């Protein structure tokens, strides 16, 4: 994906200018990352973006902004994103690059017009909204959908004696989309595992005590496998049940 992603950026800048001569222009690029500056791999993403543009012969000033998603409410995220867009507008930004679902989702739902006026390149989108892409011809990039059929199958094969799969979520839009994807996958493969069942637990809709009792204590956790379609702060607890997820953010907890 990395081999394809950064040539795509160079191509977009070439289309914008009609030529790709670094001596003629320096482009202003806004890179919006979904989580905090302290997330371990974020500096690597910024470095790779810089290297990719440099290899493509593009001279660019890259400004990296951090949304700090999962810490703020969605309304607060939108406020932060509007501030990010206003700063980008003042810098006369030529291109926006986003990393992961939260950055792109908030960018397109914050109410600012900037993402509709200049090219946007997305990366790491696990739950793409095709309707958004259809009405935004200025958006391009790559998605990285999770194959939950494979993830669920691996979870059951690794822990065959654990018969209860718990899909853990909160009430956020992306988390609920992840739950739907897990449920659809389970419908496809559950006939292979007739002794297993999948149940959904929402940490914002159900008593935390009951959830903690189910998956955090040895005397109950032995029969559970936790499926986390989207990483949530609750999962930073010391769970006794194994957790299967597809987000790099899980590796920081």
Regions found by a protein language model. Give the residues of each.
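Short hydrophobic alpha-helices and adjacent helix-cap/hinge residues
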Residues: 2, 20-253
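Bacterial N-terminal signal peptides
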Residues: 7-17
């Amino acid at each position: 994906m990395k081999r394809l992603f950064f040539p795509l950026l160079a191509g977009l800048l070439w289309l914008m200018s009609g030529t790709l001569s670094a001596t003629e222009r320096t482009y202003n690029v806004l890179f919006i990352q979904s989580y905090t500056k302290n997330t371990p791999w974020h500096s690597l993403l910024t470095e790779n973006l810089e290297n990719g543009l440099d290899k493509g012969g593009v001279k660019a000033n890259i400004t990296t902004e951090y949304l700090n998603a999962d810490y703020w409410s969605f309304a607060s995220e939108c406020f932060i994103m509007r501030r990010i867009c206003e700063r980008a507008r003042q810098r006369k930004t030529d291109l926006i690059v986003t990393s992961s679902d939260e950055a792109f989702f908030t960018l397109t739902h914050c109410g600012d017009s900037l993402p509709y006026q200049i090219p946007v390149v997305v990366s790491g989108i696990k739950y793409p909204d095709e309707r958004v892409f259809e009405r935004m011809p200025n958006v391009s990039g790559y998605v990285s959908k999770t194959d939950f059929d494979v993830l669920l199958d691996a979870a059951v094969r690794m822990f065959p004696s654990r018969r209860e799969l718990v899909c853990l979520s909160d009430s956020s839009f992306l988390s609920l989309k992840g739950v739907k994807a897990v449920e659809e996958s389970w419908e496809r493969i559950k006939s292979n595992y007739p002794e297993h069942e999948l149940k959904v637990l929402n940490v914002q809709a159900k008593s935390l005590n009951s959830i903690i009792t189910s998956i955090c204590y040895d005397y109950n956790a032995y029969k559970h496998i936790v499926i986390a379609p989207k990483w949530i702060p609750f999962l930073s607890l010391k769970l006794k049940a194994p957790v299967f997820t597809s987000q790099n953010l899980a590796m920081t907890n």
